[in-house]
């Protein structure tokens, strides 16, 4: 784990009395809240050392672009909606623009911006019900409802209610996995599905979110000190951490994370015993059969081949044919008869291995 100068961090965010207040610490957002739920150390890095983040992968970049595209399509379902188009960091003007749209009774507001309790949120869609209440609609490019969608909506509800906005219903708007594209303009009423998550999201917003925000604010108020968090499943679940490399670059050769089917219980036990390398796991530690095989291979530094594999290969009849094919998928279907995320083959190759070792393509 890298180390950082405490004075560097503190000087950026402390006030004249060297005491942290909500005015001194970084603002939380929807994404930072999700990060804080996953790992306190990741939240610390995101707020104080964002430069340490891994470079975004092609998949992450594509996912972001797909999300933006789906969000724009969702806007088309709310004619007359007003887009709050100020930059994320121009929050004062964004909030003023939001209030203006509300005062003008806009039927829907896209990227409506509110702040409460040092948390800044931008709502995907805030639909005006015409009776002084609003519906909160979170748009996702996924085809199913996930737990993190509930927490995402819940923190927004917490801020909206704290800001005095009356929310009647909360929805997740996602892609319909059964939608089949018939060509021409998309039927948006069929492309999208709305899940009513009002009850569970409001309950979470009024109980768990308050507790979670208090914990996260305490992490950020703690004089900029890096919290202690062991590596674990939170490094990749529910998302690959943006600071994965930072926490894993100094691990020993063949760390315990390479053990197959490593349970939380075993991980905790190993860390408690200060064992981070597979080679340091003592004999009789209670590993599974597969894990013990890995330990033995690491200790012997030799390749082990299961005899049954050789037997299986000897039973094969030549020539052997290997079929390789490539597929593509589009989030929003572009070809008639296809669905969101459907795998569409577009290329194949056949490799033929002869008994004398020659390969034919």
PLM features: residue spans?
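Metal-dependent nuclease catalytic cores in nucleic-acid-processing enzymes
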Residues: 147-171, 349-354
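Metal-dependent nuclease catalytic regions and adjoining charged, substrate-binding loops involved
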Residues: 14, 144-147, 162-243, 360
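Conserved RNase H-like, two-metal-ion catalytic cores of nucleic-acid enzymes
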Residues: 114, 308-361
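Metal-dependent nuclease catalytic cores that hydrolyze phosphodiester bonds in DNA/RNA
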Residues: 2-133, 264-305
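Active-site ExK catalytic segment of metal-dependent nucleases
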Residues: 111-113, 122-128, 133-145, 152, ...
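Short secondary-structure boundary/capping segments
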Residues: 53, 185-190, 336-343
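A charged, amphipathic alpha-helical module
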Residues: 209-317, 327
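Flexible loop/turn segments at secondary-structure boundaries
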Residues: 52, 144-145, 179-180, 250, ...
């Amino acid at each position: 784990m890298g180390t950082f100068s405490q004075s560097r961090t503190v000087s950026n965010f402390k006030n004249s009395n060297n005491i942290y207040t909500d005015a001194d610490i970084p603002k939380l957002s929807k994404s930072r809240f999700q990060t804080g739920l996953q790992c306190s150390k990741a939240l610390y890095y995101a707020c104080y050392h964002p430069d340490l983040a891994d470079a975004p992968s092609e998949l992450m970049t594509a996912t972001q672009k797909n999300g933006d595209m789906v969000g724009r399509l969702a806007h088309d379902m709310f004619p007359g909606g007003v887009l709050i188009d100020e930059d994320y960091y121009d929050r004062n003007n964004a909030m003023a623009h939001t209030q203006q749209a509300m005062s003008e009774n806009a039927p829907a507001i896209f990227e409506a911006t509110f702040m409460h309790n040092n948390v800044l949120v931008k709502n995907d869609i805030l639909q005006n019900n015409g009776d002084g209440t609003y519906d909160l609609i979170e748009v996702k490019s996924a085809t199913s409802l996930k737990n993190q969608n509930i927490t995402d909506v819940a923190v927004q509800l917490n801020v909206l209610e704290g800001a005095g906005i009356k929310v009647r219903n909360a929805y997740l708007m996602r892609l319909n996995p059964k939608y089949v594209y018939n060509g021409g303009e998309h039927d948006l009423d069929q492309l999208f599905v709305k899940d009513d998550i009002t009850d569970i999201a409001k309950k979470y917003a009024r109980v768990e979110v308050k507790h979670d925000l208090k914990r996260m604010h305490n992490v950020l108020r703690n004089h900029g000190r890096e919290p202690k968090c062991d590596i674990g499943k939170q490094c990749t679940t529910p998302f690959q951490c943006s600071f994965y490399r930072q926490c894993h670059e100094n691990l020993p050769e063949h760390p315990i994370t390479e053990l197959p089917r490593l349970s939380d219980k075993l991980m905790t036990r190993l860390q408690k015993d200060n064992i981070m390398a597979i080679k340091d796991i003592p004999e009789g530690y209670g590993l599974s059969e597969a894990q013990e095989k890995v330990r033995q291979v690491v200790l012997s530094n030799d390749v082990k081949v299961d005899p049954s594999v050789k037997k299986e290969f000897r039973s094969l009849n030549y020539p052997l044919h290997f079929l390789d094919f490539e597929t593509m998928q589009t989030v929003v279907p572009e070809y008639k008869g296809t669905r969101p995320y459907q795998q569409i083959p577009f290329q194949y190759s056949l490799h033929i291995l002869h008994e004398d070792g020659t390969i034919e393509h």
